[in-house]
Amino acid sequence: MPTVIGFEGSANKLGIGIIRDGVVLSNPRHTYITPPGQGFMPRDTAKHHQEHAIDILRRALDEAQIRPQDIDCICYTKGPGMGAPLVAVAVVARTVAQLWKKPIIGVNHCIGHIEMGRLITGANNPTVLYVSGGNTQVIAYLQKRYRIFGETIDIAVGNCLDRFARVLKLSNDPSPGYNIEQMAKKGKKLIELPYTVKGMDVSFSGILSYIECMAHKLLSSEECTPEDLCFSLQETVFAMLVETTERAMAHCGSNEVLIVGGVGCNKRLQEMMDVMAKERGAKLYATDERFCIDNGAMIAQAGWEMFQTGSVTPLEQTTCTQRFRTDEVEVTWRD
């Protein structure tokens, strides 16, 4: 039963998790939170990760009640993600691997989400909707690859929500998307917004540009409230995601759908997806914020699967890449 530690830091969350044979032993994380109306810059985010890495590592070991010599493999996020934060965490992982004299594995961030979702929910072979601040993909497994059947052609859905939260000067604590979700619950009026679906692909830049331009006018004229705008944005973008996911399920003949990624925590998205799934006689699988949001355990779990099949990354190849597509990885651990 190998024990694997995973280091995640592709965006504003630093997480270190430990997995042993499918059991999460520890999974602490720390989030870099900026003032309302601001995003997070790569350099500042990397500095945050550097400052908190030792503390989070110590917490992970203490909570798991294990020692460095009990670890069999070190795993880190190779990509995709923001360059500076990725590198900052990779340096920590490489250093730990050399100090502890352990093998190291570079893990695809998206595959970490998928494998964690499968582990926690028990989903067997689902169509996967991966939605976060940096990614929006509809995925299914086929012939040793996680195939991308549909994706955003511009910005990610989480990026769309986060940027609109800045327009409204919403707090980034715990996350802008969460605060939009809470405001949307109070919205009563649905504002018509651009709806762009192209086959199984989606586009969010147009809807964001439109609502950014119209927000001041609509709010100053009291045609609607900020809550109405949050409600309208959520309903529109989530309807787009449900439509494309259903199309992929029909194409693959799937009776399971799994939502992963930070936006997957959204209860309204889960609710809308569940309605669609039940109408198709399918089942929805979703996780809570412990595992939907970026965390170290998901990197450990994907790395554990890879380690079991003999995958190890030579130290000189433990680089990072901001662009690392899901379908680039050969999935050796699945039939």
Swiss-Prot record:
Catalytic activity, as annotated: L-threonylcarbamoyladenylate + adenosine(37) in tRNA = N(6)-L-threonylcarbamoyladenosine(37) in tRNA + AMP + H(+)
Residue positions binding substrate: Y130, V131, S132, G133, G134, D162, G177, E181, N266
Keyword Cell cycle: no
Manner of cofactor binding, per the entry note: Binds 1 divalent metal cation per subunit.
Keyword Acyltransferase attributed: yes
Residues that bind a divalent metal cation: H109, H113, Y130, D294
GO biological process, one term: tRNA threonylcarbamoyladenosine modification
Pfam families reported for this sequence: TsaD (PF00814)
Coiled coil: none
UniProt keyword annotations, A-Z: Acyltransferase, Cytoplasm, Metal-binding, Nucleus, Transferase, tRNA processing
Self-association state and partner proteins as the record states: Component of the EKC/KEOPS complex; the whole complex dimerizes.
Function: Component of the EKC/KEOPS complex that is required for the formation of a threonylcarbamoyl group on adenosine at position 37 (t(6)A37) in tRNAs that read codons beginning with adenine. The complex is probably involved in the transfer of the threonylcarbamoyl moiety of threonylcarbamoyl-AMP (TC-AMP) to the N6 group of A37. Osgep likely plays a direct catalytic role in this reaction, but requires other protein(s) of the complex to fulfill this activity.
Name the UniProt record assigns to this protein: Probable tRNA N6-adenosine threonylcarbamoyltransferase
